[in-house]
Amino acid sequence: MSTDLLEPSAPITTITTVTTVHTHLRPIDRDGLMAFADKGRNNPASRGTNKVHTVMEGQYRSLSYVGNHAPVVVDEPLHLFGQDTAPAPGEIVLSGLGGCLAVGITAVATWKQVKLSKIEVFMEGDIGNPAAWGAGGALQKTPPEMGFQAIRVKVLVEGDAPREVLDEIVQHANFYSPVANSMRNPIPFEISLAD
């Protein structure tokens, strides 16, 4: 075995060119958005109806059907006696909130003609179920003591506007979010057996 060191014949040079590519999220139709806004302004009492059909598979796993979409699967984690095959109901609620906030941020940014390159919504919710769904737990608890007790949302948003403008867009979208307002405000709720 030779102990001679090999000398390189020429120095190795690496040239790296960095190119920053800025892409924007797929836009929505601004003209359509403005027409929708006009419709709401001209008829502020207008309402739509969302319909969902939920079918229990067994244990706590259920399938919720919405239009022609694939079913939304809901389950509970193992420590709550589910199979942990899908998000829990509270996580689905937070998912709906995140989706609604992201839609609102997109709409407000489009209205203000700000191009966004990223929206990520991070949510946490402190939820209580001491009554064990009413199945013999802390039955003295009242509705305000059950369910979500606090929700925290952080939004990562990037676009072609200063941070202050992006924050204004997020706050505006939150203020007018149908799902956020459903969670913040008491709403009439009724339940009965189907015919």
What are these model-predicted stretches?
Residues 2-95, 105-195:
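Extended beta-strand/beta-hairpin segments
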